[in-house]
Curated annotation (Swiss-Prot):
The keyword Transmembrane does not apply. Belongs to the short-chain dehydrogenases/reductases (SDR) family. Homodimer. The active site is at Y151. PROSITE patterns: ADH_SHORT. This is Alcohol dehydrogenase. NAD(+) binds at residues 10-33. It comes from Drosophila silvestris. Transmembrane segments: none annotated. Keywords: NAD, Oxidoreductase. GO terms for molecular function: alcohol dehydrogenase (NAD+) activity. One of its GO terms (cellular component) is cytoplasm. Substrate binds at S138.
Length: 254
Protein backbone atom coordinates (compact mmCIF):
# COMPACT_ATOMS: atom_id res chain seq x y z
CA UNK A 1 0.00 0.00 0.00
CA UNK A 2 1.25 3.45 -0.85
CA UNK A 3 0.78 5.72 2.17
CA UNK A 4 1.18 8.91 0.14
CA UNK A 5 -2.19 10.58 -0.57
CA UNK A 6 -4.12 7.89 1.31
CA UNK A 7 -6.76 8.33 4.03
CA UNK A 8 -5.95 6.54 7.28
CA UNK A 9 -7.85 6.06 10.54
CA UNK A 10 -5.61 5.23 13.49
CA UNK A 11 -7.29 4.03 16.68
CA UNK A 12 -5.01 4.80 19.65
CA UNK A 13 -2.60 6.72 17.47
CA UNK A 14 -1.27 8.80 20.34
CA UNK A 15 0.08 6.03 22.59
CA UNK A 16 3.68 4.88 22.93
CA UNK A 17 3.99 2.79 19.78
CA UNK A 18 1.01 4.62 18.31
CA UNK A 19 2.48 8.10 18.44
CA UNK A 20 5.81 7.11 16.91
CA UNK A 21 3.93 5.22 14.21
CA UNK A 22 1.75 8.27 13.56
CA UNK A 23 4.92 10.31 13.14
CA UNK A 24 6.35 7.84 10.63
CA UNK A 25 3.05 7.70 8.73
CA UNK A 26 2.85 11.49 8.54
CA UNK A 27 6.38 11.63 7.13
CA UNK A 28 5.17 9.38 4.30
CA UNK A 29 2.58 11.97 3.26
CA UNK A 30 -0.95 10.61 3.55
CA UNK A 31 -3.74 12.95 2.54
CA UNK A 32 -5.55 12.51 5.85
CA UNK A 33 -4.65 10.94 9.17
CA UNK A 34 -7.64 10.63 11.49
CA UNK A 35 -6.58 9.84 15.05
CA UNK A 36 -9.10 8.26 17.39
CA UNK A 37 -7.99 8.10 21.00
CA UNK A 38 -9.50 7.98 24.47
CA UNK A 39 -7.25 10.75 25.77
CA UNK A 40 -6.84 14.04 23.97
CA UNK A 41 -3.24 15.17 23.52
CA UNK A 42 -3.25 18.58 21.80
CA UNK A 43 0.54 18.84 21.94
CA UNK A 44 0.97 15.56 20.07
CA UNK A 45 -1.61 16.57 17.45
CA UNK A 46 0.15 19.91 16.99
CA UNK A 47 3.47 18.11 16.59
CA UNK A 48 2.04 15.82 13.91
CA UNK A 49 0.61 18.79 12.03
CA UNK A 50 3.94 20.60 12.15
CA UNK A 51 5.82 17.50 11.02
CA UNK A 52 4.14 17.62 7.60
CA UNK A 53 1.80 20.59 7.04
CA UNK A 54 0.52 19.01 3.80
CA UNK A 55 -1.18 16.24 5.80
CA UNK A 56 -4.58 16.95 7.32
CA UNK A 57 -4.59 15.66 10.90
CA UNK A 58 -7.96 15.26 12.61
CA UNK A 59 -8.64 14.07 16.15
CA UNK A 60 -11.81 12.52 17.55
CA UNK A 61 -12.20 11.26 21.12
CA UNK A 62 -12.97 7.55 21.07
CA UNK A 63 -13.12 4.75 23.61
CA UNK A 64 -13.19 1.34 21.91
CA UNK A 65 -15.42 -0.03 24.67
CA UNK A 66 -18.43 2.08 23.63
CA UNK A 67 -21.44 0.29 22.09
CA UNK A 68 -21.14 -0.73 18.45
CA UNK A 69 -23.81 1.78 17.42
CA UNK A 70 -21.68 4.66 18.74
CA UNK A 71 -18.67 3.47 16.79
CA UNK A 72 -20.73 3.28 13.60
CA UNK A 73 -21.99 6.81 14.22
CA UNK A 74 -18.45 8.14 14.61
CA UNK A 75 -17.25 6.34 11.49
CA UNK A 76 -20.16 7.76 9.52
CA UNK A 77 -19.02 11.24 10.51
CA UNK A 78 -15.52 10.43 9.27
CA UNK A 79 -16.66 8.83 6.01
CA UNK A 80 -19.06 11.70 5.32
CA UNK A 81 -16.09 14.05 5.58
CA UNK A 82 -13.41 12.02 3.76
CA UNK A 83 -15.65 10.04 1.38
CA UNK A 84 -13.08 7.23 1.27
CA UNK A 85 -10.80 5.58 3.82
CA UNK A 86 -7.96 3.31 2.73
CA UNK A 87 -6.58 1.93 5.99
CA UNK A 88 -7.88 1.31 9.52
CA UNK A 89 -5.32 0.68 12.24
CA UNK A 90 -6.72 -0.87 15.43
CA UNK A 91 -4.16 -0.07 18.10
CA UNK A 92 -5.97 0.21 21.42
CA UNK A 93 -4.50 -1.86 24.23
CA UNK A 94 -3.93 -2.03 27.98
CA UNK A 95 -1.44 -4.10 29.95
CA UNK A 96 -3.02 -4.63 33.36
CA UNK A 97 -4.22 -8.08 34.41
CA UNK A 98 -5.84 -6.62 37.52
CA UNK A 99 -8.48 -5.16 35.16
CA UNK A 100 -9.81 -8.37 33.70
CA UNK A 101 -13.01 -7.16 32.04
CA UNK A 102 -11.45 -3.98 30.68
CA UNK A 103 -8.44 -5.85 29.30
CA UNK A 104 -10.73 -8.10 27.27
CA UNK A 105 -12.98 -5.18 26.30
CA UNK A 106 -10.11 -3.02 25.03
CA UNK A 107 -7.69 -5.58 23.63
CA UNK A 108 -10.19 -7.88 21.96
CA UNK A 109 -13.82 -6.72 21.92
CA UNK A 110 -12.84 -3.18 20.93
CA UNK A 111 -10.92 -4.46 17.92
CA UNK A 112 -13.85 -6.68 16.92
CA UNK A 113 -16.38 -3.86 17.26
CA UNK A 114 -14.36 -1.23 15.39
CA UNK A 115 -13.71 -3.73 12.61
CA UNK A 116 -17.37 -4.75 12.47
CA UNK A 117 -18.45 -1.11 12.34
CA UNK A 118 -16.25 -0.19 9.40
CA UNK A 119 -17.66 -3.09 7.39
CA UNK A 120 -20.82 -0.98 6.97
CA UNK A 121 -18.74 1.28 4.73
CA UNK A 122 -16.29 -1.17 3.14
CA UNK A 123 -17.99 -4.53 2.62
CA UNK A 124 -18.22 -5.18 -1.11
CA UNK A 125 -21.43 -7.17 -0.58
CA UNK A 126 -23.05 -3.86 0.33
CA UNK A 127 -21.48 -2.06 -2.61
CA UNK A 128 -18.46 -0.93 -0.61
CA UNK A 129 -15.00 -0.45 -2.09
CA UNK A 130 -13.14 -2.71 0.33
CA UNK A 131 -10.26 -1.56 2.48
CA UNK A 132 -7.28 -2.59 4.57
CA UNK A 133 -7.09 -3.27 8.31
CA UNK A 134 -3.93 -3.51 10.41
CA UNK A 135 -4.61 -4.94 13.87
CA UNK A 136 -1.98 -4.42 16.53
CA UNK A 137 -1.80 -7.69 18.43
CA UNK A 138 1.28 -8.98 20.27
CA UNK A 139 3.93 -11.68 20.28
CA UNK A 140 2.06 -12.97 23.35
CA UNK A 141 -0.49 -14.17 20.81
CA UNK A 142 2.17 -16.70 19.74
CA UNK A 143 3.37 -17.73 23.19
CA UNK A 144 1.89 -16.27 26.35
CA UNK A 145 3.63 -14.44 29.15
CA UNK A 146 2.15 -16.75 31.76
CA UNK A 147 2.22 -14.18 34.57
CA UNK A 148 -0.23 -12.06 32.55
CA UNK A 149 -2.62 -14.71 31.21
CA UNK A 150 -5.53 -12.31 30.64
CA UNK A 151 -3.47 -9.92 28.52
CA UNK A 152 -1.88 -12.82 26.63
CA UNK A 153 -5.24 -14.48 25.97
CA UNK A 154 -6.80 -11.21 24.78
CA UNK A 155 -4.01 -10.75 22.26
CA UNK A 156 -4.22 -14.36 21.12
CA UNK A 157 -7.94 -13.81 20.54
CA UNK A 158 -7.25 -10.65 18.53
CA UNK A 159 -4.70 -12.53 16.43
CA UNK A 160 -7.13 -15.38 15.77
CA UNK A 161 -9.83 -12.88 14.79
CA UNK A 162 -7.42 -11.18 12.40
CA UNK A 163 -6.29 -14.36 10.66
CA UNK A 164 -9.93 -15.37 10.20
CA UNK A 165 -10.82 -12.02 8.63
CA UNK A 166 -7.96 -12.35 6.16
CA UNK A 167 -9.51 -15.56 4.85
CA UNK A 168 -12.81 -13.72 4.33
CA UNK A 169 -11.22 -11.07 2.08
CA UNK A 170 -12.61 -12.67 -1.08
CA UNK A 171 -16.10 -12.24 0.38
CA UNK A 172 -15.82 -8.80 2.00
CA UNK A 173 -13.15 -7.12 -0.11
CA UNK A 174 -11.34 -6.17 3.09
CA UNK A 175 -7.77 -7.37 3.57
CA UNK A 176 -6.30 -7.74 7.05
CA UNK A 177 -2.96 -8.43 8.70
CA UNK A 178 -1.59 -8.39 12.24
CA UNK A 179 1.20 -6.35 13.79
CA UNK A 180 2.79 -8.22 16.70
CA UNK A 181 5.34 -6.19 18.66
CA UNK A 182 7.80 -7.80 21.02
CA UNK A 183 8.79 -6.15 24.29
CA UNK A 184 8.93 -2.45 23.53
CA UNK A 185 10.00 0.32 25.89
CA UNK A 186 6.74 2.14 26.58
CA UNK A 187 5.02 3.65 29.59
CA UNK A 188 2.51 0.79 29.43
CA UNK A 189 5.18 -1.85 29.97
CA UNK A 190 6.38 -0.07 33.11
CA UNK A 191 2.81 -0.28 34.45
CA UNK A 192 2.35 -3.97 33.62
CA UNK A 193 0.48 -5.72 36.48
CA UNK A 194 0.27 -9.49 36.79
CA UNK A 195 -2.87 -11.55 37.34
CA UNK A 196 -3.66 -11.96 41.06
CA UNK A 197 -0.23 -10.43 41.71
CA UNK A 198 1.47 -13.75 40.95
CA UNK A 199 4.60 -11.82 39.94
CA UNK A 200 4.82 -8.31 41.43
CA UNK A 201 8.00 -7.63 39.43
CA UNK A 202 6.66 -8.71 36.04
CA UNK A 203 7.34 -5.34 34.38
CA UNK A 204 10.85 -5.15 35.81
CA UNK A 205 11.62 -8.72 34.77
CA UNK A 206 10.41 -8.15 31.22
CA UNK A 207 12.62 -5.10 30.83
CA UNK A 208 15.66 -7.13 31.86
CA UNK A 209 15.35 -8.89 28.50
CA UNK A 210 16.44 -7.36 25.18
CA UNK A 211 13.89 -4.79 24.05
CA UNK A 212 13.24 -2.42 21.18
CA UNK A 213 12.38 1.25 21.07
CA UNK A 214 9.02 2.59 19.98
CA UNK A 215 10.76 4.21 17.01
CA UNK A 216 12.20 0.90 15.83
CA UNK A 217 8.77 -0.66 16.13
CA UNK A 218 7.12 2.25 14.30
CA UNK A 219 9.56 2.17 11.40
CA UNK A 220 8.91 -1.53 10.87
CA UNK A 221 5.18 -0.96 11.24
CA UNK A 222 5.32 1.40 8.27
CA UNK A 223 7.23 -1.22 6.27
CA UNK A 224 4.44 -3.70 7.03
CA UNK A 225 1.83 -1.18 5.89
CA UNK A 226 3.71 -0.67 2.64
CA UNK A 227 4.03 -4.45 2.12
CA UNK A 228 0.24 -4.77 2.50
CA UNK A 229 0.09 -8.58 2.61
CA UNK A 230 -3.33 -9.98 3.38
CA UNK A 231 -3.12 -12.52 6.20
CA UNK A 232 0.46 -11.63 7.12
CA UNK A 233 1.41 -12.24 10.74
CA UNK A 234 4.16 -9.70 11.30
CA UNK A 235 6.55 -10.01 14.23
CA UNK A 236 8.16 -6.68 15.16
CA UNK A 237 10.84 -7.54 17.67
CA UNK A 238 14.32 -6.30 18.51
CA UNK A 239 14.23 -3.84 15.63
CA UNK A 240 13.40 -6.53 13.05
CA UNK A 241 10.35 -7.17 10.88
CA UNK A 242 9.67 -10.84 10.21
CA UNK A 243 6.71 -12.67 8.69
CA UNK A 244 5.61 -15.58 10.87
CA UNK A 245 4.54 -18.87 9.34
CA UNK A 246 1.63 -20.15 11.42
CA UNK A 247 1.72 -23.91 12.07
CA UNK A 248 -1.61 -25.59 11.39
CA UNK A 249 -2.48 -28.38 13.82
CA UNK A 250 -6.14 -28.74 12.82
CA UNK A 251 -8.34 -27.88 9.85
CA UNK A 252 -12.10 -27.34 9.97
CA UNK A 253 -12.38 -28.68 6.44
CA UNK A 254 -14.74 -25.92 5.33
Amino acid sequence: MVIANSNIIFVAGLGGIGLDTSREIVKSGPKNLVVLDRIDNPAAIAELKALNPKVTITFYPYDVTVPLAETKKLLKTIFDKLKTVDLLINGAGILDDTQIERTIAVNFTGTVNTTTAIMDFWDKRNGGPGGVIANICSVTGFNSIYQVPVYSASKAAALSFTTSLAKLAHITGVTVYSINPGITKTVLVHKFNSWLNVEPRVAELLLEHPTQTTLQCAQNFVKAIEANQNGAIWKLDLGRLDAIEWTKHWDSGI
